[in-house]
Amino acid sequence: MSRLFMILLVICVITLGTDASQAEDSGTEKKSWPMPDADLKAFQSWPLTDPDLKSAFKQYNWQRMPYGTRK
């Protein structure tokens, strides 16, 4: 029983040690859900200055405002 416990302990220490060393080597925190490059490029090129998008956003926010705060 104690051998099994020691083996599991060693495996856990090795696993945690490699995760920590990889995070230190990269200089950033380890991300659990990385975004694919294609999705990131599509998101960055999305036209945030589109007038239709702005008007729709303002209209949606206007509808969400509580009654009595509209000017």
From Swiss-Prot:
Task of the protein: Probable neurotoxin with unknown target. Possibly targets ion channels.
GO CC terms of this entry: extracellular region
UniProt keyword Cell cycle present: no
Swiss-Prot/TrEMBL keywords: Cleavage on pair of basic residues, Ion channel impairing toxin, Neurotoxin, Secreted, Signal, Toxin
Protein name: Conotoxin Pl064
Tissues with expression: Expressed by the venom duct.
Molecular function terms from GO: ion channel regulator activity; toxin activity
Keyword NAD: no
Note: The mature peptide does not contain cysteine residue.
Positions of the pro-segment in this chain: 21-28
The family this protein is said to belong to: Belongs to the conotoxin NSf-1 superfamily.
Compartment(s) of residence: Secreted
UniProt source species: Conus planorbis (Planorbis cone)
Main localization (coarse): secreted
Signal peptide from the UniProt entry: 1-20
